[in-house]
């Protein structure tokens, strides 16, 4: 499971998720990727479930790159605890994913295998996603479907 080794502050503000992702919008490592169409928090358990779904389908072929990391903590109070008396204890870790961010990449497999593996991974995530290919021309838009 992905968790930070150490953090400066255990309890963070929730923050806003306005606009698009600033970086990580292009495929850098593999040939195919899974792009977020909407913004959302993705928990470390969801990332792990998506990774397992992809690697199980691909068996021993290809390579998977995870481009997001859960570095934000979220807090929760216990069930039946009354309001007030401070912020709750850290309950887990999330990755803040904005629209346009490439979350997972796959390389070394055919397009059909990559498409199905990323579809299985997207079923484990709480957001809408789309399958993207690395553009063949450098600096140009891909004109294939």
Swiss-Prot record:
Keyword RNA-binding: yes
One GO BP annotation of this record: translation
InterPro entries for the chain: Ribosomal_uL16 (IPR047873), Ribosomal_uL16_bact-type (IPR000114), Ribosomal_uL16_CS (IPR020798), Ribosomal_uL16_dom (IPR016180), Ribosomal_uL16_sf (IPR036920)
Entry keywords, A to Z: Ribonucleoprotein, Ribosomal protein, RNA-binding, rRNA-binding, tRNA-binding
Ribosomal protein among keywords: yes
Domain of life, per lineage: Bacteria
GO cellular component: cytosolic large ribosomal subunit
Entry-linked Pfam families: Ribosomal_L16
GO terms assigned for molecular function: rRNA binding; structural constituent of ribosome; tRNA binding
Protein family per UniProt: Belongs to the universal ribosomal protein uL16 family.
UniProt function note: Binds 23S rRNA and is also seen to make contacts with the A and possibly P site tRNAs.
Subunit architecture: Part of the 50S ribosomal subunit.
Name used for this protein in its record: Large ribosomal subunit protein uL16
